[in-house]
């Protein structure tokens, strides 16, 4: 058995090496970006949900730069962030241009910190992304809180802030956080009330044969509150019919869009996948911004896509496609391949049966040009 395992592992390593060599040749020495590395990640038992998100985040350049900068700071106690920083640093400082890295330390820490991921079952890539970003933000805020305990910041300046004040935004917020405004207009007195809500990613409903722009417009459709759902108007001091809609007040540097492809079917008593064809362009401008939006004309470029392959949330596979400089790459765990930009259309979804196996965009990462 041990001999068979060794032979199998050796064959796997040879295959990885061949793939890496082929990729390097395909890109060519003159076209290969300076100081860039393309490394696949070893799958430790259904960890493709994690690998695909990590690859997408690595090629969100502002995020990568902040994680690498964190690595250069004085050593902190081990956390999910230190493990992520070690992984990114390991990729960025490799002598080889292409290859494979085992993210074992990160996976071990992830399973230790959250029982949801402490198994060998397939997990949801969006849940992992959400958990990772919020955990990193919590770690950074806790570290800043510790630095403030003596009333001094790392640069030696005295901190006079109230300890009960809202935590300072972290670089996670600076990169991914946007703001929604929930507007409600009373149909009796026409008074408009609004409430702001921050987000790190937007989850949008999907429909057949549409585009991400259409999905975002649907996200901001006007909803009528009536019957038992009437709105309590402070001006009228009674429940009234009202119009409610959600608009984007502040657009983030990197816009992460989650396509809600998994829906619970009562007749099946389980979740199934909506493999609908949803076109996502290489360039994007949002039109559902509020009147007082701080940056309504922001243009975005697609930089990464986490793709779900399969027919349901608990089975299937995740891969990532990313833009690096002027070309696109596909990361499938330890395999890395160069693909044409036109090949992205293959990941829009299907025009036929919703329950069929499909390779369809699940999380889109758009980076602002400014």
Curated annotation (Swiss-Prot):
<keyword id="KW-0539">Nucleus</keyword>
<dbReference type="Pfam" id="PF00443">
    <property type="entry name" value="UCH"/>
</dbReference>
<comment type="function">
    <text>(Microbial infection) Forms a complex with Epstein-Barr virus protein EBNA3 which is an active deubiquitinase activity that may select specific substrates to promote B-lymphocyte transformation.</text>
</comment>
<keyword id="KW-0378">Hydrolase</keyword>
<feature type="short sequence motif" description="Required for plasma membrane localization of USP12/WDR20">
    <location>
        <begin position="1"/>
        <end position="4"/>
    </location>
</feature>
<dbReference type="InterPro" id="IPR018200">
    <property type="entry name" value="USP_CS"/>
</dbReference>
<feature type="domain" description="USP">
    <location>
        <begin position="39"/>
        <end position="369"/>
    </location>
</feature>
<dbReference type="GO" id="GO:0005886">
    <property type="term" value="C:plasma membrane"/>
</dbReference>
<comment type="function">
    <text>Deubiquitinating enzyme that plays various roles in the regulation of the immune response and inflammation. During TCR engagement and activation, translocates into the cytoplasm and deubiquitinates its substrates LAT and TRAT1 and prevents their lysosome-dependent degradation to stabilize the TCR signaling complex at the plasma membrane. Plays an essential role in the selective LPS-induced macrophage response through the activation of NF-kappa-B pathway. In addition, promotes that antiviral immune response through targeting DNA sensor IFI16 to inhibit its proteasome-dependent degradation.</text>
</comment>
<dbReference type="GO" id="GO:0005737">
    <property type="term" value="C:cytoplasm"/>
</dbReference>
<feature type="compositionally biased region" description="Polar residues">
    <location>
        <begin position="157"/>
        <end position="168"/>
    </location>
</feature>
<comment type="subunit">
    <text>(Microbial infection) Interacts with Epstein-Barr virus protein EBNA3.</text>
</comment>
<dbReference type="InterPro" id="IPR038765">
    <property type="entry name" value="Papain-like_cys_pep_sf"/>
</dbReference>
<feature type="active site" description="Proton acceptor">
    <location>
        <position position="317"/>
    </location>
</feature>
<feature type="binding site">
    <location>
        <position position="236"/>
    </location>
    <ligand>
        <name>Zn(2+)</name>
    </ligand>
</feature>
<dbReference type="InterPro" id="IPR028889">
    <property type="entry name" value="USP_dom"/>
</dbReference>
<keyword id="KW-0963">Cytoplasm</keyword>
<feature type="binding site">
    <location>
        <position position="186"/>
    </location>
    <ligand>
        <name>Zn(2+)</name>
    </ligand>
</feature>
<dbReference type="GO" id="GO:0005634">
    <property type="term" value="C:nucleus"/>
</dbReference>
<comment type="subunit">
    <text>Interacts with WDR48. Interacts with WDR20; this interaction promotes translocation of the USP12 complex to the plasma membrane. Component of the USP12-WDR20-WDR48 deubiquitinating complex. Component of the USP12-DMWD-WDR48 deubiquitinating complex. Interacts with PHLPP1. Interacts with RBPJ. Interacts with CBP; this interaction blocks the acetyltransferase activity of CREBBP. Interacts with ITCH; the interaction is more efficient when both USP12 and WDR48/UAF1 are involved and may mediate recruitment of the USP12 deubiquitinating complex to Notch.</text>
</comment>
<comment type="similarity">
    <text>Belongs to the peptidase C19 family. USP12/USP46 subfamily.</text>
</comment>
<protein>
    <recommendedName>
        <fullName>Ubiquitin carboxyl-terminal hydrolase 12</fullName>
        <ecNumber>3.4.19.12</ecNumber>
    </recommendedName>
</protein>
<dbReference type="GO" id="GO:0005829">
    <property type="term" value="C:cytosol"/>
</dbReference>
<keyword id="KW-1003">Cell membrane</keyword>
<dbReference type="GO" id="GO:0005654">
    <property type="term" value="C:nucleoplasm"/>
</dbReference>
<feature type="binding site">
    <location>
        <position position="189"/>
    </location>
    <ligand>
        <name>Zn(2+)</name>
    </ligand>
</feature>
<dbReference type="GO" id="GO:0016579">
    <property type="term" value="P:protein deubiquitination"/>
</dbReference>
<feature type="binding site">
    <location>
        <position position="233"/>
    </location>
    <ligand>
        <name>Zn(2+)</name>
    </ligand>
</feature>
<feature type="active site" description="Nucleophile">
    <location>
        <position position="48"/>
    </location>
</feature>
<dbReference type="InterPro" id="IPR001394">
    <property type="entry name" value="Peptidase_C19_UCH"/>
</dbReference>
<dbReference type="GO" id="GO:0046872">
    <property type="term" value="F:metal ion binding"/>
</dbReference>
<dbReference type="GO" id="GO:0004197">
    <property type="term" value="F:cysteine-type endopeptidase activity"/>
</dbReference>
<keyword id="KW-0788">Thiol protease</keyword>
<dbReference type="GO" id="GO:0004843">
    <property type="term" value="F:cysteine-type deubiquitinase activity"/>
</dbReference>
<keyword id="KW-0862">Zinc</keyword>
<dbReference type="GO" id="GO:0006508">
    <property type="term" value="P:proteolysis"/>
</dbReference>
<dbReference type="GO" id="GO:0031647">
    <property type="term" value="P:regulation of protein stability"/>
</dbReference>
<keyword id="KW-0472">Membrane</keyword>
<keyword id="KW-0479">Metal-binding</keyword>
<feature type="region of interest" description="Disordered">
    <location>
        <begin position="145"/>
        <end position="169"/>
    </location>
</feature>
<keyword id="KW-0833">Ubl conjugation pathway</keyword>
<keyword id="KW-0645">Protease</keyword>
